Every structure is written in structure tokens, then in C-alpha cells.
Amino acid sequence: YSTTVGKNRPVNILLPVNYDENKEYPVLYVLHGIYCDQNTMMDSWKTHIIISNMIADGSAEEMIVVFPYMFASKDKDACDGITLENVAAYDNFINDLVTDLMPFIESNYAAATGKDNTAVFGFSMGGREALAIGFMYPDLFGYIGADAPAPGLVPGQDWALNHPGQLTEDELSYTTEMPYLIMMGAGDSDGTVGSFPKTYHEIMERNGVTHIWYEIPGEDHNSDKAISSVTYNFCRYVFRAK
């Protein structure tokens, strides 16, 4: 139940093989794109299979993976168009995550806590929200990943909206300790989010934010190759800073 939106919210939770309630596992939150839901990253992109295989062969740490539903509106159950009102509902997920979902996970599962043990990764709109979360809550999240993050993290105009921005360009910076990892990637032929991911990279570079940025040659927005690449590379490094 979410006090943020006043209703029950769906979520998928992937537990490690041989999950042991007496152990504590780091937690990765995986965020979907616009018009999608808690099933999309599994059904369309097989993110759960990629991560499970990586854990099995030792290329990723054992972890709990949480696939939430991001559209956090009190009035609507689903996104019905690209409007500022609907985008604000995706932004409101940040409140739902910190206020309701994280305490639920930490109370009901063998979840390790603290920024050393908490990561967020997202695709498209989910990538934008993952970056916002990383800059807003550096004390809670130590690992931030974004594949093809959508417009609107900072003020800007795209083909659909004039985005007011969740943060200013100057706010894409840290006055305290940075996360252990910020990774962004995108196809270099992305016709949906265009050059916005690269713009975020350039702003972070200008602001002295240590991060990894790369492009996947010839790949578009919904490319299996691009999404699986960023997922794989992020999960190789997550929870391994110490």
C-alpha cells in the first residue's frame, strides 16, 4: 500500500536462487519506461534473466531485484498521454519509492540497507527517474544506472513537451560524497530521446561528476542490444565498490 498515492501498488520481486532469510542481500530497483508497467522490463527486455544468469556465473553479486510500477498518480491508474501532468506522476514515483516501497522491501525481505547496498537502474523515463533519484538521494543510493534516459531531468524542449526540469543543470552535482557508480548508455541512433542522454553526460562532465558514459553504435531506443548492453555492464559493477 502506498501512502503517497493512497492505493495498493503492484510490484515484482526477483529473489536470488537459494534465498535465505537469515542473510542480507543488496537491493536493485529496476524502473521501466513511459506507458509501461512492472512487467515490461521482464517481458520485453528479459532483465530478470540477464541478471539471474550473471549471478549464476559470478559476474554479478547476489541481489534482490525489485520491478515497481512507476506511474504514481492519485487520480489515474495508468498513463494516457505525454502531458506534463502524466510526467509529474512518474516524477512522483520518487516519493513513493522512498516513503513506501523501500520500507516495504526492507521490512518484508532480507534486504541489506544503506547506500552501499542500494541501487537504481532505469530505461527511458525510468532512466530519467533513476538519475533524479541519484542526485536527490545520494545518502540512500550508491549505484545509479540509466539506459537512454528521457528528456526532462533538466529544463528543455523535446518534440512533445517543454519540460520544466526536475533539477537545474547546476543541481546535477554533489556537495557531499558521490555515488560509487553512475553509468549511462544509449544507442547512437536513438530517435526517441535523441541527444538528451549525451547532454546529461556533458552537464555531469562540466560539473565534475564522475560517471561512465558510452554509446552503442547503430542502435535505436528500443534496441534489445542497447538495453541488454547497459543492463549487463551496470550489473557487472553494482555492489562492488568495496
Model-derived features with residue positions:
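Non-catalytic cap/lid and distal C-terminal segments of serine-dependent acyl enzymes
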Residues: Y1-K242
